[in-house]
Amino acid sequence: MIQRPALVTPSWLEAHLDDPAVAIAQLRFEPDEDDYTAGHVPGARWWDWKAMLWHPTDRQFADPALIAQRLGSWGIAPDTTLVLYSGRNHFAMYGYWVLHEMLGHPDVRVLDGGRRRWELDGRPLSTVEPAITPVAYRPPRGARDDSSRASRDDVLANLGRTGRVLIDARSPEEYRGERVKPLPGFDHGAERRGHIPGARHLHGRDLFDPADATVKPPAELERLFRAVGAAPDQAREVIAYCRLSHRASSIWFTMTRVLGWHHVRVYDGSWTEWGSIVGVPVERPGAPAEHPEA
């Protein structure tokens, strides 16, 4: 199999803006609408991450046939190079994880630094939505590959297991149990505050250069992961989680695609699931372990 770089630079993308084999998508959630209409990478489609990747009613990823139908409706074929970016890097890396790892789309890339680096470089923006010609998309796999996911039952059954490290990628305030939601206006939280027992904290934001949002150099990433005992010679397995799994997918992406470490999975139920399950333990500094009650 040809190994393709998962991260692309703004200069690479600008050189491929007119390449018919390359499609660009800006992943967003509702507050980002004005960002897209005010100006976006030329040719970029505009995707609501949940509408593109999730089941229409269930708290579950859409099956490959449905995602394939959605991709085809946006003019994306199985041999298309798909470049994802966002105003928040986590969303693009989440999209990569779902589309490449679980769906099996062969060539997915993430724009390093996302929209921020693109604008800082003074690169062109467009207010024109691209013309789309739908195509037929045959799923590369017959079923979704869930091998990079961890379930709540798996996490619960292996709490404290030697060789397994849990990484909480939320903000320090969320980890300490001072709040559940990172920003006001979100409609999905949890019944309890705190973190999964034994989880070590590594804020997903710390994976990126604060100046331009690019991924930090490999040596710096390795230092961060070693500080929480997550390097391959320190842990047999790493499970990353956050609130909804966007920040956790950045842990997965940087470990697997930048450092080449493949002993990591994502608990995608994350805190919105764990923090509301009846009967599971919760740690919060200064408080005894909590067991949510009905």
Could you tell me what each predicted segment is?
Residues 1-35, 115-194, 282-294:
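Flexible, polar/low-complexity N-terminal or interdomain linker segments that lie immediately upstream
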Residues 28, 50, 170, 205, ...:
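Anionic group-transfer/hydrolysis microenvironments
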